């Protein structure tokens, strides 16, 4: 079974893509990372930083998660991210996404030993 940490990497990590020229990025990535298997996932964020830099966020600023849990952490610095948002005219399994790049602080939930990101909570 895929671990929570591995699932986070599959769903949210894309360190190699520092600049995305293609408006098709989300359509391709959401499919290749299996995020459209049983439905069109409405929103997903990819982080274009090294895994080590994202894992380090677990030891940065502790903040409350959206669900009220206390194991979320906000990055000290802004990170290069891409937001993928379902466009509203998807016809599953043909999911259509809008690709938006941003530089924002990320908030992740962490757990386990080693203490690593298991959930992408927000970007601010």
Curated annotation (Swiss-Prot):
Residues bearing attached sugar chains per UniProt: 34
Composition bias, Basic and acidic residues: 1-13
GO molecular function: lyase activity; nucleic acid binding; ribonuclease A activity
SUPFAM superfamilies: RNase A-like
Reactions catalysed, as given in the entry: an [RNA] containing cytidine + H2O = an [RNA]-3'-cytidine-3'-phosphate + a 5'-hydroxy-ribonucleotide-3'-[RNA]; an [RNA] containing uridine + H2O = an [RNA]-3'-uridine-3'-phosphate + a 5'-hydroxy-ribonucleotide-3'-[RNA]
Region: Disordered, residue numbers: 1-23
Keyword match Cell division: no
Keyword list, A-Z: Disulfide bond, Endonuclease, Glycoprotein, Hydrolase, Lyase, Nuclease, Secreted
Transmembrane segments: none
Expressed in which tissues: Pancreas.
CDD domains: RNase_A_canonical
Record Pfam families: RnaseA
Protein EC: 4.6.1.18
List of catalytic residues: 12 (proton acceptor), 119 (proton donor)
PROSITE patterns: RNASE_PANCREATIC
UniProt: substrate binding residues: 7, 10, 41-45, 66, 85
Disulfide bonds: 26-84, 40-95, 58-110, 65-72
Keyword RNA-binding: no
Chief site of localization: secreted
Subunit details: Monomer. Interacts with and forms tight 1:1 complexes with RNH1. Dimerization of two such complexes may occur. Interaction with RNH1 inhibits this protein.
Family, per entry: Belongs to the pancreatic ribonuclease family.
Cited function: Endonuclease that catalyzes the cleavage of RNA on the 3' side of pyrimidine nucleotides. Acts on single-stranded and double-stranded RNA.
Full protein name: Ribonuclease pancreatic
Organism: Alces alces alces (European moose)
Lineage: Eukaryota, Metazoa, Chordata, Craniata, Vertebrata
């Amino acid at each position: 079974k895929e671990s929570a940490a591995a699932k986070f990497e599959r769903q949210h990590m894309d360190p190699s893509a520092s600049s995305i020229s293609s408006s098709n990025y989300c359509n391709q990535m959401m499919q290749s990372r299996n995020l459209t298997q049983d439905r069109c996932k409405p929103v997903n964020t990819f982080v274009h930083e090294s895994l080590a830099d994202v894992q380090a966020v677990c030891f940065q600023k502790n903040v409350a998660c959206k669900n009220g849990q206390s194991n979320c952490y906000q990055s000290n610095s802004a990170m290069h991210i891409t937001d993928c948002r379902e466009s509203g005219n998807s016809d599953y399994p043909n999911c259509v996404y809008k690709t938006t790049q941003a530089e924002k602080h990320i908030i992740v939930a962490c757990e386990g030993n080693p203490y690593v990101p298991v959930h992408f909570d927000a970007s601010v």
